[in-house]
UniProtKB/Swiss-Prot annotation:
The heme-dependent oxidative N-demethylase (HODM) is a heterotetramer composed of a catalytic alpha subunit, a FMN/2Fe-2S-dependent oxidoreductase beta subunit, a gamma subunit with putative aminotransferase activity, and a delta subunit of unknown function. [2Fe-2S] cluster binds at residues 260, 265, 268, 296. PROSITE patterns: 2FE2S_FER_1, 2FE2S_FER_2, FAD_FR. This is Heme-dependent oxidative N-demethylase beta subunit. CDD domains: fer2, PDR_like. It comes from the Bacteria. Keywords: 2Fe-2S, Flavoprotein, FMN, Iron, Iron-sulfur, Metal-binding, NADP, Oxidoreductase.
Length: 309
């Protein structure tokens, strides 16, 4: 596992009643460089590990910045940050990792964000402006709650920014994707409904999957409690309704490599031998699901799961 970074909370800024920006500075030495689209995992004092996109300019590593929306159904990540984290507090984070990079072969970049999904595109925009690249940003938001960075983006991007204010203008992905040249790539970050709509519309219009990119860091949805047995050690675990299998394994001292914690990256792929599994990931093929699961999001839905761990 990569060496964690020791950081201090340098600043906290309220962007909307439910979104706050956090700036972190290194306690010693300097922060590692990163590329647009990177994220870090925060290791919180309450035991939670949450992944957040870096919204800072990749050319400036004096600080890392993230933005966090307070989730109504938070299991301790966003709630802890909003209610307990203060300037001067110390935290540990993972080094930056990038599962959502800009693609160098793209001749044009279409960025699509909804709500807090704007965060990776703040770093994207600064990098693309520096390159002199051809791009446009489509941002759907609700006034007063999920409209973080709108004023900043208007000044920075001008006509490259296309706004979709809830109740006034609808983001129509079918129209947005029509008639685009083969060198165009589209990137999306936002709720599950946005990502599914993008995949459906792009497929219907014949877009190559190589030109369609998305990121999802949504926390695992709760479900029914279930039991797990580890085949190699014989250890048995109870996974609570509001706990992921990955969290239960970590609490039991079983470390599983992971990055996104949202069923996207494939890093935590784990073999399973028997039991009933509800797969909720966006990574495994139907064939792979017969023998592997993603403990960050997958759950048991009947008989206990036997993992090859």
């Amino acid at each position: 596992m990569s060496t964690l970074l020791d950081v201090r909370v340098a600043a906290i800024r309220e962007l909307t009643p439910v979104i706050r920006e956090y700036s972190f500075e290194a306690l010693a030495s300097t922060l590692p460089g990163f590329s647009a689209g990177s994220h870090v995992q925060l290791h919180l004092p309450n035991g939670r590990r949450n992944a957040y996109s870096l919204l800072s300019d990749p050319a400036d590593t004096r600080q890392y910045r993230i933005a966090v929306r307070q989730q109504d159904a938070s299991r301790g990540g966003s709630r802890y940050l909003h209610q307990h984290l203060k300037v001067g507090d110390r935290l540990r984070l993972s080094p930056p990792a990038n599962l959502f990079p800009l693609h160098g072969e793209a001749q044009k970049h279409i960025l699509v964000a909804a709500g807090i999904g704007i965060t990776p595109f703040l770093a994207y925009s600064q990098e693309l402006l520096r390159r002199g690249a051809d791009f446009e940003l489509h941002y759907a938001y609700r006034a007063g709650s999920s409209d973080a960075y709108v004023d900043e983006l208007r000044q920075q991007l001008g006509p490259r920014l296309h706004e979709y204010l809830s109740g006034q203008r609808r983001l129509d992905l079918a129209s947005l994707l029509q008639g685009r040249t083969l060198g165009t790539h589209v990137y999306a970050c936002g709720p599950q409904s946005l990502l599914l709509d993008l995949q459906e519309q792009a497929s219907a219009q014949g877009w190559s999957p190589r030109r369609v990119h998305w990121e999802a860091f949504a926390a695992a949805e709760p479900g029914q409690p279930f039991r797990v047995e580890l085949a190699r050690s014989g250890q048995q675990l109870e996974v609570a309704a509001d706990e992921s299998l990955l969290e239960a394994l970590e609490a039991a001292g079983v470390e599983v490599p992971n990055l996104c914690r949202g069923g996207v990256c494939g890093q935590c792929q784990t073999p399973w031998l028997k039991g009933d599994v509800e797969h909720r990931d966006h990574f495994l093929s139907a064939n792979e699901r017969t023998s592997s699961l993603m403990p960050c999001v997958s759950r048991g839905c009947g008989s206990p799961i036997l993992l090859d761990l």
